C-alpha cells in the first residue's frame, strides 16, 4: 500500500531531520490518512492540515455524479509536520513537556518558583510547567530565566539543570533551535483557494500537460516562506517539474531536488537553468 511505499523514504528523511525541520506532506485526503501513522512512527508531530480548494473550474463539465456516486472532488491536502525533540534521561526518551517538569523537580524547588524566575504572577506554572493540554514551549527568554534561577537556587548535588550533556545548561540560542520556524501570514487560513494551473504556468508538450500534479508556484512559495528563512535548506524528494526549486531561488533558499522520471527531469532541469539565467 501507499504506507509501505512511503516508509523507506520517511525513514531516510527522519535521519537527517532536526527539531528545526518542517515537513509539508502533499497528497489526497485518503492518501494522507494512510501515511499519517508512518510519519508518527518516525517522530513526526502533526501540526495542521491545509486544504487546497481548486474551485468549481476544476470540475469537468461532463462529470456524472449519478455514476461516480459522490460529490466532485476539488481538493488536495498539504499537511504540516514538525520533528518533535526528545530528551534522554537514563535511556528513557522524554518529550519536552515531561523533561521540563523532570528537570525542575530535580532542583528541589517548588513549581511556584518558576513564576518568580520568569518575573510573572502565574504564567510559568500555567503554561510552561502544566501537565494539561494548555502547555506550550517556553520562549527562549523565559527558558534562559528558568535555567539561571534553577542553577542559582537549586540543590547543589543536581547541577547543572536543564542540560543535555551533563556539563552545562542549554544556551538560549540552542533552545531556539529546538522548535521549527513558523511565520503566520496575515489573513491566511488553512483553506487555500487557488485555481488549478492554467496558461503559461502549466508546462505542456504538444498541448498536453507534462506533469499532472504540478503545483502552483504561489502555494509552494507560501509554505517555504512560512517555515524557513533566507539561506535555509529546502529538500524536495519528489521534485516533479522543480517548482520548489524555482520558488527557493526566488526566495533565496538553498534547494535540493530529486526526480527519477527521466522525461520529467529533462524538462525540470531546463526550467531551472532558464530561471537561473533570468536571475543573473
Whereabouts are the PLM-identified features?
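Short, conserved SAM-binding/catalytic segment
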Residues: 269-280
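Core catalytic lobe of class I
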Residues: 1-266
